[in-house]
Amino acid sequence: MTRKQRRLLMIGGAGVVLIVAVGLVLNALRDSIVFFSTPKMVAEQHIEAGKRFRLGGVVEPGSLQRGEQLRVSFKVTDGAASLPVAYKGILPDLFREGQGVIAEGSLDKAGVFEADTVLAKHDEKYMPKEVADALKKDGHWKDDYGKKSPGETTAGQTSANAAEGGK
């Protein structure tokens, strides 16, 4: 084998190893690329029981039920589908019906999302585009979603501190 053939063989082998490594990394990160799944996505993907993922949407009004020993249940909706959630623990201060939420956990065999972490979103202006589009499509969109709060000018400024030069 000549030097040129040996060099080409080494380059080809390194290329194959690199392609396999990139493929393995992308396969491992496939489920982590999406920050969360909406209830409609969960229904369409038929996620098996026990697989961990994040569920995002809006807490369905009228669905919150508080039980004993910090147990709560509620439904998360994206306007197109809803999914029951069970959680045991202290809910965030900003958690309320009609508010954005992200829960982390897994589905049980009955199709209930067993959350071990619940994060409340600050307000509707941070609502995911997919959820906002689904709410608009189904006629559940409120006109005050995404509007600035009274006295708010730009992110992090109120009209009072904007007049002082943003201090």
Curated annotation (Swiss-Prot):
Keyword Cell inner membrane part of the UniProt annotation: yes
Subcellular location(s) per record: Cell inner membrane
Record keyword NAD present: no
GO cellular component labels: plasma membrane
Membrane topology category: Single-pass type II membrane protein
Polar residues biased stretches: 151-161
Family designation: Belongs to the CcmE/CycJ family.
HAMAP family: CcmE (MF_01959)
Protein name: Cytochrome c-type biogenesis protein CcmE
Organism this protein belongs to: Rhodopseudomonas palustris (strain TIE-1)
Gene: ccmE
